[in-house]
Amino acid sequence: MVQQIDAPLREDVRLLGNLLGETLKQHAGQELFNQIEQIRALAKGARDGQAEAEKQLEQLFLELPDEELLPLTRAFSHFLNFANIAEQYHVVRSRRQAEFDPDANSPNPLVHLFKKFKDKNISTEKLFQQICDLKIELVLTAHPTEVSRRTLIQKYDDINACLSQLDQQKLTPRERQNALANLKQQISSAWQTDEIRQHRPTPVDEAKWGFATIEQTLWNAVPKFIRELNELVQDNCQQNLPLHIAPVRFASWMGGDRDGNPNVTHQITQEVLWLSRWQAADLYLRDIENLRWELSIQSCSEEMVQAIGSPHPEPYREYLRATRERLKATRHWLAQRLQGLEADDSNVIKSKDELLQPLLLCYRSLIDSNLPEIANGQLLDFIYRVNCFGIELLKLDIRQESGRHRQAISAITEYLGLGNFESWTEQARQNFLIQELQSKRPLLPKYINEPEGSLIGHPDVQEVFATMRTLADQPPESLGAYIISMAEYPSDVLAVLLLQKEAGIQHPLRVVPLFETLKDLDGAATTMNTLFNMHWYKQHIQGKHEVMIGYSDSAKDAGFMSANWAQYRAQEELTAIARKHGVQLTLFHGRGGSISRGGAPTQQALFSQPPGSISGAIRVTEQGEMIRFKFGLEGIAMQNLEIYTAATLEATLLPPPEPKAEWRELMNRMTDHSVKVYRQTVRENPHFVKYLRTVTPELELQMLPLGSRPAKRKVSGGIESLRAIPWVFAWTQIRLMLPAWLGTGAAINEVIADQQKATLDEMLQQWPYFQTLIDMLEMVLSKADANIALYYESHLTEDEDLKVLGNQLRQRLKDAVETLLTLKDESKLLSDNEVLDQSMQVRKPYLLPLHLLQAELMKRRRDYLAERQAEHTPVDHALMVSIAGIAAGLRNTG
């Protein structure tokens, strides 16, 4: 089965593996290379069911001295990263090859979708208008799941470029030899580079990483994507897309997300906002230099002559000179501000239109001069970029927890002698907030709200006020939404609006409640209905609203199935409430990479939403390592832009069917049972927390410098205080994958036992939501491995209570697999997804040694800490590499 993988991909994996082997022999010695080959052979035997091979492997690691564990861990980790590189490049290669074959299916999902629209009699006018109205926004977030250093990511990109060069058909022998030498050099450089950051990245570092994603891939991918889309529209609708088209835009939380992250302050937010504008100005300056070089032509319109003031031999260059100087002035001003210096901002570009209008005049002039081929060259790409990225590159969302806003309002009411706002009833809070929002006077004397004044309240409260003042100083286009995490009540939304008013924000950020626990999801529609019934609020929103659905915390709270169904119901109810009030609703999906945090293939995920919930507009977070997997290469970035566009169009114009009443009834029954089973284990079993902390690397994960955000919301506390990302990450590392299946398998099994399989079969055949849920469950179960989880347990604990719990969990995992196979009438997992199955089979001989090494490293580290009360650096380093390597091998962290 492993041999069925595409030959070019297999050749690339073999080439990278061989070059890594040569590098190891050269830099680490023949002995290490021989040892790695021995381990790899034993691991392949273990994969193929040879119990003796696995025993030999376990014994080998037990006997190795500390200093030999790190190079072994690094070698297997590197191979898995190289396998990822080969797979990503193969996607790009396959797309290119399909274009050479007229009989091949197009890799662009929009091509197939347009045919489907034609078959379904969707009019070209309706399709064209819907494409023009698309509002897809992808929000890059810095959740700590990207374990690879940026330094190594750059080297991986260089390796990718080498593979691309070697694929060229007409390389001379010398060129091929040079390309191979370059590839070996990059692999050698990667081996000589430490995989682990020495320090946690700051929020500014994270923001720069987001800017780099734009610069390196999306800057070119976006205009290429829009050109392809326009060609399809020309072919199918016989029209050109308007120049202002921007179906997909980008925003960021990096530098704006302060929920549980004390490192994100108002100063950091200001720095990131300036950096973002500086990066945009720098990129546009490069573009305008190239554009002026191209536009050396003489022919121009009368409008252009008038704009210049007199005829000129090179009118476009002359006309764009002022825009170039303004971009230089903008970049200089921002550089000065970043250094803490004042500077003249009179020539600074402060809005998208100031940059766009000169470009549009050039475009009109070229068209009027019968030069469309030049108008539709670099200039059109420039226009597309400005419409997509604006002057800010990435709009910055602000996120803060609802309790901080309540504290801030309480500080105000107590200062004014009105009592403690937090102790008031919800109705009293709403009455006060609406009254003050309608008032024309400020709540506080101006000096109270100034940095040099006698600020009121706790430092956390002062930081809320300072953040609001910072937002008041920004160009409106730089800012996105203000997200309220842990939103519960209508007053949570009103409080943020009042704080913005009090800070003097002339163009208030739209306020987006994030409903994330099971209880809050169930109450989301009621909360929004209350707000929509308020006359002042209804006028304020002007017929548009955004609501964010949280996936991570609800799944940690109630388990995958219950959370998933609660999210579905909440979206249905919110859509109905918005429709009732005549409000255009945009749902913002806070998805992660793992299914426990809402991860799923994009097209499946969007098409499985409730009918009507995606009406041409959607926001989605792209988190951590998923940014690199989806947008790290230009070809893959193009593919994902196509997928998002196709999925949004299909969900809008051909929404899935309404679920039948009996389907809903069965889902309600299954989720009730699922949450009960899940919470009995996670909340009620007295040994569960100890099991998590003993058998998984949950505690060790906290030492890995992944992101700027702490792993816990609070310093102390149990499961409830642990963030959803390390929660999922810990179970993934030991391959138990517990958050995704615990409770779900038991719930499905219960209804099958009750003779309900026929209904489940119908749901699986006819309901995209249920199909996606089961597909995602199967994918995660295929990555689970009870034997590996058992090895961690037997290696790390002698506690009989924990062993009993471990046996129960592994039995439930086995039951979940059997239940899924029964449901799908299959004999093995992934029988209908050979690509993923083969990918996992190839990775197993490299993953197994890493798991065995990690368990041994965890044991040694804990023993050292118990005996010496000090850290042991070689073991710590190897342990961190093992965590990163397993994450790479599974293509999932949190």
Curated annotation (Swiss-Prot):
One GO biological process term: tricarboxylic acid cycle
Active site: 143, 556
First-level EC class: lyase
PROSITE patterns reported for this sequence: PEPCASE_1 (PS00781), PEPCASE_2 (PS00393)
E.C. no: 4.1.1.31
Gene Ontology annotations for the cellular component aspect, listed alphabetically: cytosol
Keyword Iron-sulfur belongs to the record: no
Cofactor requirement: Mg(2+)
MF terms in GO: magnesium ion binding; phosphoenolpyruvate carboxylase activity
Stretch forming the signal peptide: none
The UniProt record lists the keyword Lyase: yes
InterPro entries, alphabetized: PEP_COase, PEP_COase_bac/pln-type, PEP_COase_Lys_AS, PEPCASE_His_AS, Pyrv/PenolPyrv_kinase-like_dom
Catalytic activity: oxaloacetate + phosphate = phosphoenolpyruvate + hydrogencarbonate
Keywords: Carbon dioxide fixation, Lyase, Magnesium
Function per UniProt: Forms oxaloacetate, a four-carbon dicarboxylic acid source for the tricarboxylic acid cycle.
Similarity-based family: Belongs to the PEPCase type 1 family.
UniProt cross-references to HAMAP family, sorted A to Z: PEPcase_type1
Protein name: Phosphoenolpyruvate carboxylase
Originating species: Acinetobacter baumannii (strain ATCC 17978 / DSM 105126 / CIP 53.77 / LMG 1025 / NCDC KC755 / 5377)
